[in-house]
Amino acid sequence: MGEIPVRGSGEGEADMQAGDPATGVVIATLVLYKLVLIAIGVWASRLNRNESDFFLGGRGLGAWVAGLSYAASTSSAWVLLGFSGFVYVYGVSALWMVPGIWAGYVGVWLWFGPRLRAETAERNYVTVTDFMAASAGPSTRALIAILAGGLVLFTFVFYIAAQFGAAAVAFESQFALPHTESVLLGAVVILIYGLLGGFWAVSLTDTLQGAMMALIAVLLPAAGLVAAGGPVQMWATLSETMPSAYLDITGERGFVPFLAFAFGVAAIGLGTFGQPHLMARLMAVKDEKARRTGFTIAMSWAVLVYFGMALLALSGRALLGEIFDPEALFYEMANLLLPAVLAGVVIAAILSAVMSTVDSLLIAASAAAAHDLKLIRLFPRREVMISRVVMASICVFAVALTLSVDATIFDRVLFSWSALGAAFGPVIAARVMNAAPKGWAVLAAIVLGFATTVLFYTYGQIGAEAAGGGLSGMLARLAAIPGDPFERVVPWILPLVLVFSFRQPRPVEDRRS
């Protein structure tokens, strides 16, 4: 089938010009949504009295807020746009990613959750770095905080900038807004409610976003399935129009290539265990009952949304055939299947989801700078004010990067999910499993996990031919294996071996079951 233009190009752009009813609905929906976000920020501002309130919501998150805000922070627009596009391209074999992602939910909430919540509350830890460095001596603990805070700040500033860029592209394509205005519009609204309300505002707005995403993940895939003629007809269409590998669970790969691909895409879930903004949700949940209920809510959301997006991808392939940009599938299907006004509402929700990805990252990056790098110690009893100044500074810097640095640079740093996961995840896992790694081992594990991810990512970008022979050629060939198992798994294994090999006895009173 031929390519169907999206709104913002060709005839689609004409539909969204000023005066078109859908355009008015999109703008009205966005304005209303942003006003709600700002109102939440104003309301939540009265809850911020100290550093713990601003970065952890006073450790008072209930089950629904914790569960839905975690889910939205984990996936946000990525699952609607990126995951659906991935399944659209690779077919049924792409679904091997899903068990790994779901396993990440289970591991964080049921394995990490009990100890992480209890110990961080008891000892008043503000960031996950405090938890990682607990077994180190004072001087080494300070080095761990500086290293971890610096890595979070570096990767998240670039990731935030990438999200601002993605939001800008969406605004440009939908409303023909200039690039600078598009970036500033998203940044200003996020900064306002984040500055006012801190973690509470971010969690509440992410809860709203998570609920909206779940609703969309039901409505649009259902419309797609009906338009494709139902599940039987959809499968028959794909069988006739696509290569047989598209509907094969292995992608018709050989046994070893299939294992590498499935293992690699499933290992995306490993990155979950080292994300500071996700660990913060577990640290902030108010009690064990809320944690258990929050897991049920988050897991139900994940099953619903990932199933819906997989269905959307397959029905979209049956309906549309080949399209220019797979990550535009969601927009394509909304424009094709829904009335103009309703499609406008859906697109407005996606634009909001793209921008709302940033808020949790901003809080985590601000915590890294203000708490881990000890900036708040320069101004005693001004913790909230300093945290807000840091957040504003990070946002301004990210906006400047968005406007001045080539977008391809942003693409190269989107590996931060795997890099931070490999840097922090093994150390957190060791602490959760009652190990007390020596301080220097924690430092070395963080460096090793991050550096190994960078190594394989870099060689994957270079390619085997450009790398030549010898060790470089071998690393490039390993990095080029479909599914990227060496980029996602090896950087986890090496630090894990390190922290378990160099442990110190824990005092009896510090041991937990």
What are these regions (language model features)?
Residues 12-513:
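Membrane-embedded helix-loop-helix hairpins and adjacent transmembrane boundary segments
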